[in-house]
């Protein structure tokens, strides 16, 4: 599919040759040496032969453009990005009319690396200071294993409770009461109910998708109003998913809560995190459990699922949402994809011709004044789109947000960098910042990042554990990590 995607959009990219076909045909036809050679070769229709040669050259130029873009994108974002681009193309097809994709001259594929040039100039998300609550950090490190546990273990099939236990790891006092890991997808994700007597909690763990491309495709969906909550919008598919999980686990939850008197802890990763957030909302204000137990939610890599954040139904909920570095899923919503598409279309409309390819080929390093001007045109075009979005939202795509208190895990390289530290992995140093969901309302294409690695549950665990070790080493002082 990604090959088809590149071919479709890159076919238009060869327009940078202008009227190459016509020009080459004319050159062949007007060259006496070619005419003489054609006669010797027995070519009767010289114009047809010249035209065929022009088409061949044009085709090869198009293939070279495709390979250039693929090489550039792979170097910038890692090989996994092709699956991500495939998913993004599917997402943009959902809103092709609004984006006017048919009017694209070069295609979105050609624009993405250039849009990424501007994204690389942006500052990191605005934060509200470091996470200094050591007890809460301890809990996040602990509960991320339960989010991972919802995936189970591939080598233990047919024994869901045992699979969850092994995936969670050795944790005393944990008893899995119910588990259904065989269901997958956004309709009814895998899930389990457990009692943790050590932490004194009943746990509802919800599984996410196993691939980044699936997570992106499923995360980008329509919004719908939540019943009994006028004005509160939620991701339509994940809201249905949350209702299905509650229906399948209500009995086990009620029984475990009644037996123990413990509060309820809901957790998940990726789409499982989005579903966990919506389960928290539904069980709080729409269809509460008996006795209305105290509830908390730990969401790792959640997509935007609710809005507006000022709605009364969201007040009083205890939701902790974690975003790892440049993970795209917490930034993936229909509104955000639409605005990324607008940025691509703005770049596509620029009359840059061969400058766009030279900039891609040379890592956006202009070699002359013309290329410098071309780069600035690109930066200005994308910035203008971002400024327009800041003024108002598109009425067809209401914004959804990651709910609760947001924590951003930054892997420290240079100050404020989202790039990998170019040292041994054991020396990578994470920090965790408190932030607001509004700071993640853009689907960014950051160079030097790995979309898949940033999204994996293991990456979240590594970041949280690394920051915990740092706080312990410095006696709770967050300090600036150099």
Model segments located where?
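Low-complexity, disordered terminal segments
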Residues: 1-7
